[in-house]
A protein has these predicted regions:
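Membrane-embedded beta-strands of outer-membrane beta-barrel proteins
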Residues: 53, 88, 129-133, 173-175, ...
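Short glycine/proline- and aromatic-enriched beta-strand/turn motifs that initiate or cap beta-hairpins
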Residues: 22-71
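Outer-membrane beta-barrel "beta-signal"
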Residues: 249-261
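Short loop/turn motifs that connect adjacent beta-strands in outer-membrane beta-barrel proteins
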Residues: 22-26, 61-65, 94-111, 136-144, ...
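Outer-membrane beta-barrel transmembrane domain signature
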Residues: 151-230, 259-261
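Transmembrane beta-strands of outer-membrane beta-barrel pores
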Residues: 32-38, 70-74, 114-120, 149-155, ...
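Cleavable N-terminal export/targeting peptides
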Residues: 1-26
Length: 261
C-alpha cells in the first residue's frame, strides 16, 4: 500500500473507531465481488476479485461513510494487481446542527459533505466538498443526491503516479430499497455517479464518465434463520461509460456477497 493511501485510510479507520463508539447507529460490512473486467488502457480482460470493507454510521452531527477496496486479478499487467482504493465521506446535517424541520416534505435533510478518494498504485488523491440532499421516498430505506467538487491533489508523474488532473465536479445518486417476495427478503441498492471531464498534466483529455453500480441481493441469512441482513447474496452490475476517463465502455455482472457484523 502506498504512503498517501495508507495515511488516508489509517485516518479513516481511526475516525470510524471514534465515531462508532458514540454513534446513534452503525453498520459495518465485508463485501466480495467477482467478475471479468477490462483494463481501459490496454483493452485486455481479466477475472478480478474485489474485497471491500464498508462502514456507515450516524451520530449527533450527521453521518459518516467509507469503504476500502482491495483488488486483484489473474493478469499481470500492472493494473489492479493487488491494489487498494478507498473513499471517505463525512456529512454534517443542517437538520441536526440548525434544528431545521422538513415536515411533510419529500426533502428529509440537507447536509454539508467533506470527502476524499484515494488510490494506491496511481497515487491519486481527490477532495470532494459539497452538498448532500436526503429524500423521504416511500419504500426506500434511503435515497440521496450529492453534488461535490472533484479537486485533485495527486502526486502526478513526478511522484511516480498517474498524471495530475484539473478539477471538476461529481454528481451522485444513492439508494436502498428493501422488499419481500414470498417470504424471502431482498434489497435493491447501489449508486450512480457522473464526474465531469477534465485535462491531465500532459494536456490530454480526461473524459467525463458515468458509473452505475446497482446491486440486487437476497437475504440468504434470513432464509437460513440467521439475523436479517447479516448475509446477503446477489448480483452487482457495473456499467462504466468512459472508464477512468478513456474511450472504454464496460458492462460487467459480478457475483456479490456481503456479510454484516
Amino acid at each position: 500500500m502506498k504512503t498517501p493511501l495508507f495515511s488516508a485510510l489509517t485516518a479513516s479507520l481511526m475516525l470510524s473507531t471514534g465515531t462508532a463508539a458514540a454513534a446513534d447507529w452503525s453498520n459495518t460490512q465485508l463485501h466480495l465481488n467477482h467478475g471479468e473486467f477490462k483494463n481501459p488502457f490496454s483493452q485486455q480482460e481479466a477475472n478480478q476479485t474485489i474485497y471491500s470493507l464498508q462502514h456507515a454510521s450516524g451520530y449527533r452531527y450527521g453521518d459518516n461513510f467509507f469503504f476500502i477496496d482491495y483488488s486483484t486479478d489473474d493478469l499481470d499487467d500492472g493494473y489492479q494487481d493487488g491494489d487498494f482504493y478507498g473513499e471517505w465521506y463525512s456529512t454534517f446535517s443542517l437538520g441536526k446542527l440548525a434544528d431545521l424541520k422538513f415536515n411533510d416534505s419529500a426533502l428529509q435533510d440537507v447536509g454539508i459533505v467533506m470527502g476524499f478518494n484515494a488510490a494506491g498504485d496511481a497515487k491519486v488523491m481527490k477532495y470532494l466538498p459539497g452538498v448532500k440532499l436526503s429524500w423521504n421516498i416511500d419504500g426506500f430505506s434511503f435515497f440521496s443526491t450529492t453534488l461535490t467538487g472533484y479537486i485533485d491533489d495527486s502526486r502526478g508523474l513526478n511522484g511516480g503516479g498517474a498524471p495530475k488532473e484539473t478539477n471538476s465536479y461529481m454528481l451522485d445518486v444513492a439508494w436502498g430499497y428493501p422488499f419481500t417476495i414470498g417470504g424471502h427478503k431482498f434489497e435493491f441498492t447501489g449508486h450512480v455517479e457522473y464526474i465531469t471531464g477534465r485535462d491531465n498534466e500532459l494536456g490530454g483529455d480526461v473524459k467525463g464518465w458515468l458509473l452505475a453500480q446497482p446491486i440486487l441481493r437476497w437475504d440468504l441469512g434470513h432464509a437460513l434463520e440467521m439475523p436479517d441482513n447479516q448475509l446477503m447474496l446477489g448480483i452487482e452490475w457495473q456499467y462504466w461509460q468512459n472508464k477512468l476517463g478513456t474511450d472504454t465502455n464496460e458492462s460487467v455482472p459480478q457475483i456479490h456477497l456481503a456479510w454484516t457484523f
